[in-house]
UniProtKB/Swiss-Prot annotation:
Family in the record: Belongs to the peptidase M20B family.
Binding positions for Zn(2+) 1 per the UniProt entry: 78, 140, 196
List of catalytic residues: 80, 173
Protein name (record): Peptidase T
Lineage: Bacteria, Pseudomonadati, Pseudomonadota, Gammaproteobacteria, Enterobacterales
GO cellular component, one term: cytosol
Task performed by this protein: Cleaves the N-terminal amino acid of tripeptides.
Amino acid sequence: MDKLLERFLNYVSLDTQSKAGVRQVPSTEGQWKLLHLLKEQLEEMGLINVTLSEKGTLMATLPANVPGDIPAIGFISHVDTSPDCSGKNVNPQIVENYRGGDIALGIGDEVLSPVMFPVLHQLLGQTLITTDGKTLLGADDKAGIAEIMTALAVLQQKNIPHGDIRVAFTPDEEVGKGAKHFDVDAFDARWAYTVDGGGVGELEFENFNAASVNIKIVGNNVHPGTAKGVMVNALSLAARIHAEVPADESPEMTEGYEGFYHLAGMKGTVERADMHYIIRDFDRKQFEARKCKMMEIAKKVGKGLHPDCYIELVIEDSYYNMREKVVEHPHILDIAQQAMRDCDIEPELKPIRGGTDGAQLSFMGLPCPNLFTGGYNYHGKHEFVTLEGMEKAVQVIVRIAELTAQRK
């Protein structure tokens, strides 16, 4: 475990932010740097079949050390960090034996406060790794990477019985492209776990059904002084569209299993406006109903417009709830829960109010629930991870490998 923190700090020092709207995968050069570093480390550890695809998926195998027909299992994390907050020049702070209260994030006014983040009350006495208030930390998902790498080392050094262990590190998860170029056949695992979750004990096998909605509004601009009966204000139409979207079904008003509509971007002029929504729901029927609702709104607002003015709506599904695929293989969750209990952790099955590579992989034939990393407050300057949580994640990964080997 002594190298766990060292690995993590090494990985977060690299800027691996992904970038939306880029055709190439990985979308940024920084991701390649981390992938090449990990490839070198895996080879130094003696793993076999170490491959790095042209689309930036790194795979490797820790060969079984016991005979028998043991199913090959996998562990997966992503190398990119969120585009939502800078990942350049990350300067982690290590707070040992946290005693409560506010934690100053670097030099300035930014603090990590238990008033805003009550989970801190549960972490007294632990070692917290925070940001300096200027960037995100990158625990999402470099904590997962460090934990997988450390677990591999533990399995080797302690000669713990295990079958074939596949590992993979993927790019561009944060922009929804992480699993699109994942070769499930080449990975050759019966099932896998993404290590991309949050607090200790979290085990996730349900996620949102997700879609994006892009709306193009074409109006007609003339001088405001002579506009009566002629001007069609695209911005006004955009405002009318958003006014029709249920205000109490937005991200800031929902939790748990509740779905939402989220206006993620809007820009425009009188002549042309563009809106970008994301739609999320755990229930497939409700998900489809939300998409229909957006089409109905666009049709209603666009009714009676001049033929040269129009509203164009394009809906694209992003991913689906992996629950329907994972529940077909209950032993995958049983093993993970037993591993946690064996490590004195009470499993907490909860839905992911988001998505992971595992969601897409589950529909590609690789059932893939999500394990905790020990991290919190992802995608922003209040992100942090506990060293103890990371150590627990390593223990659970190792125990899953051990329990799987006992299922001969």
